């Protein structure tokens, strides 16, 4: 694989808050087995094939999404000579990295997946997807803290101890920010986190992000804000009241910090949106005409939920437009969601009741991811290879220092997928959660076709995700070999 970071260097990953590649579509009705790296050709379940070049455009027309109003929408692969090693782990240039995380936005609430007829209008993220890659099979964890800890460390919950909410990152953990500063090849990187942190156990240490290697922190340390218009911001250990709309304030802080940088940087932008409390956004973002009364919110919660996603999409566009051309051309943006959609706002036409945030079902762990920009030579395509949130640590390490530091994390570097089809070296995905007895604590493993769940009460189930995307029929008794294979992988991850 060859990467180039010459002229157009903006790379975007969509993980449910701002630019990230959209997640796996196990809910597809296609009954054909899709191998890792293959392009999904039936995106809407109507049985008609869609070519790589048609997929995202078709989705945009179906959902009524308009083009983003950004200064330079061309965020596809760079022009100019190709650079870097053929294995994709040693780019000659050091790109800036913007990782955007949305809070509680599952794939049923992501326009890039078309699992629902009730979707947000996200032209900025849609543009990134058209000029990059939408990932179909990405696993986070069932909750906020557990996914964030996995992203930060590249380790699964069983190996960090962060298995529930609120998570408390062990003091000996090495975060990706700490790795960048400690590694000689990437020690010139400046790092910042804006927004939700949620891995300090609620202990009240105002310097917690900085203690874990974050150079600059501006956000909310308390797990969830109670008012998007009146909240407490912590800036490098100092608290103060903030009455600027939360989504806007985070982008304001990110813009100011990025504008000051003279060295390559890694910025982590973790929106609270669209997490509750649901509310009407400021008038300039309120395109749905929401009244904001409690009665209206109670009656139309998903409308308010989707409005928050649309607002963060607009503000993401403002952030991108704020960058001078040289900075933007050398910036990789990743956008991803942290977990599935909560029950109160879940589209039950996409996932069954109970298959939401907090569960080990696909509706709880599959997240959206979009990648676009520098070094991404595949554009307007859907990648079916398996990706885990623990894979971001080695991938970012490879982008910034030329090494994925194999051995210090549970992840796999998926940088090669940016320019080559079918090169994600992952056979299985793993996730775990101990935070919700009602929905079932335990751990899960999936392959390209099957999913195994081991609940803490000793129950084991197996689902065929191709023929049973709703995960309703347990086929464990007739597929003992597959059960053993997936169970063994999970036990290996767990050190059992």
Q: Model-predicted segments: where are they?
A:
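N-terminal acidic, proline/glycine-rich, low-complexity intrinsically disordered segments
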Residues: 2, 27-29
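Sec-dependent N-terminal signal peptides
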Residues: 9-17
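C-terminal motif of bacterial Sec signal peptides marking the signal peptidase cleavage site
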Residues: 22-25
């Amino acid at each position: 694989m060859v990467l180039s970071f010459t002229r157009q260097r903006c790379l975007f990953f969509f993980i449910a808050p701002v630019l990230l590649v959209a997640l796996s579509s196990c809910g597809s009705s296609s009954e054909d087995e899709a191998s890792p790296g293959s392009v999904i050709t039936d995106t809407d379940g109507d049985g008609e094939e869609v070519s790589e070049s048609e997929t995202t455009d078709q989705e945009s027309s179906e959902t009524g999404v308009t083009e983003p109003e950004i200064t330079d929408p061309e965020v596809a692969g760079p022009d100019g000579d190709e650079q870097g090693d053929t294995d994709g782990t040693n780019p000659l240039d050091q790109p800036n990295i913007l990782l955007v995380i949305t809070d509680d936005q599952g794939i049923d609430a992501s326009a890039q997946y078309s699992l629902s007829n009730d979707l947000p209008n996200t032209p900025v993220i849609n543009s990134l997807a058209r000029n990059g890659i939408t990932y179909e099979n990405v696993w986070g964890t069932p909750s906020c803290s557990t996914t964030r800890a996995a992203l930060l460390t590249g380790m699964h919950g069983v190996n960090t101890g962060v298995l529930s909410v609120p998570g408390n990152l062990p003091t000996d953990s090495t975060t990706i920010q700490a790795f960048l500063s400690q590694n000689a090849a990437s020690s010139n990187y400046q790092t910042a986190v804006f927004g939700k942190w949620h891995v300090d156990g609620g202990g009240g240490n105002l310097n917690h992000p900085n203690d874990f290697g974050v150079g600059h922190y501006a956000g909310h340390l308390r797990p969830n804000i109670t008012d998007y218009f009146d909240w407490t911001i912590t800036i490098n250990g100092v608290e103060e009241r903030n009455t600027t709309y939360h989504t806007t304030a985070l982008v304001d802080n990110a813009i100011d910090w990025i504008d000051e940088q003279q060295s390559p940087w890694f910025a982590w932008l973790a929106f609270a949106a669209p997490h509750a409390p649901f509310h009407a956004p400021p008038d300039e973002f309120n395109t749905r005409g929401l009244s904001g009364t409690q009665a209206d919110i109670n009656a139309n919660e998903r409308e308010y939920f989707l409005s928050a996603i649309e607002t963060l999409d607009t503000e993401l566009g403002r952030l991108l437009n704020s960058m001078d051309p040289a900075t933007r051309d050398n910036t990789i943006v990743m956008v991803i969601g942290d977990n599935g959609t909560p029950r109160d706002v879940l589209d039950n036409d996409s996932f069954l009741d109970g298959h939401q945030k907090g569960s080990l079902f696909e509706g709880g762990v599959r997240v959206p991811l979009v990648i676009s920009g520098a070094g991404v030579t595949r554009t307007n395509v859907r990648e079916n290879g398996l990706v885990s949130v623990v894979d971001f640590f080695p991938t970012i390490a490879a982008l910034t220092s030329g090494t994925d530091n194999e051995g210090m994390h549970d992840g796999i570097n998926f940088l090669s997928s940016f320019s080559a089809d079918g090169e994600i070296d992952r056979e299985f995905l793993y996730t775990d959660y101990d935070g919700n007895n009602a929905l079932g604590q335990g751990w899960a493993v999936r392959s390209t076709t099957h999913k195994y769940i081991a609940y803490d009460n000793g129950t084991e189930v197996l689902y065929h995700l191709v023929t049973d995307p709703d995960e309703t029929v347990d086929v464990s008794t007739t597929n003992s070999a597959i059960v053993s294979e997936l169970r063994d992988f999970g036990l290996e991850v767990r050190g059992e």
